[in-house]
Amino acid sequence: MKDLNTSEITNKIIPKSIADEVAIALSHYPELKDTPIEFRFKEKIKKSFMQAQPKFSGIFKNKKNRSYFVMITEHFHIENESFSISEVPSEVLIGWIGHELGHIMDYQERSGINLIGFGISYLTSHKFIKEAERAADTFAVSHGMGDYILATKDFILNHAHLSSIYKDRIRKLYLSPEEILLLVEELKD
C-alpha cells in the first residue's frame, strides 16, 4: 500500500513535501530514470544535510540492478543553529538534491568492492572526501545544474546564521562558486 505522504516517479519514492524539487533535479539526470532511488527523511546526518548511498543489500548486485537512498534531514543542526528544510529556498534544495544525484552517478560506475573501499576512504580521508564532493558537484554542473549548485553555495556561504567553521569546511571540500562558473563556461564550448 502506498504511503499517502510520498509521491512516486518511476522507481522513485519521494516525500511529497519535496516532490517538486526532486522531480526538477531528476529531470537533469535522464540516465537515472530507471534507477531505484528512495528519498527519505532521517533524524540526523553527521556533518551534512543530505547523504546519498547505495542500499547495502544491493552493493554486490549487477550495477544496473542497484538501488539507492538519498537521506535528508528535515531539521538541520549546525553547531548552535537550527533551521527547517521548509525554510530552504526551492532552487537551493534542487541544487542539494542535484549534488546528491551526482554522487549516485559516481556510485553507478563502481564495483561492489570499490563501493566498500569508497565508504571506508570517505570515513577516513579528508583528501578523499574532497575528491568525492567535487566529483558530485562536477556531475551536477555537467548535467545542466550549474545555477542550482551556485544557489546552494550562495545560500551556505552567505547564510548569516551558519558558523564560519561550517562555511570553511564547505569552502575546503566543494567546488567554489568561481570554479563552478568556470566549469559552466567550459561546458558551453
At which residue positions do the language-model features occur?
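A metal-dependent hydrolase signature that marks the N-terminal structural subdomain at the beginning
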Residues: 1-64
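Short coil/turn segments at secondary-structure junctions
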Residues: 5-9, 81-84, 88, 120-123
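Active-site scaffold of zinc-dependent metalloenzymes
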Residues: 51-90, 107
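Short alpha-helix carrying the canonical HExxH Zn2+-binding catalytic motif
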Residues: 88-105
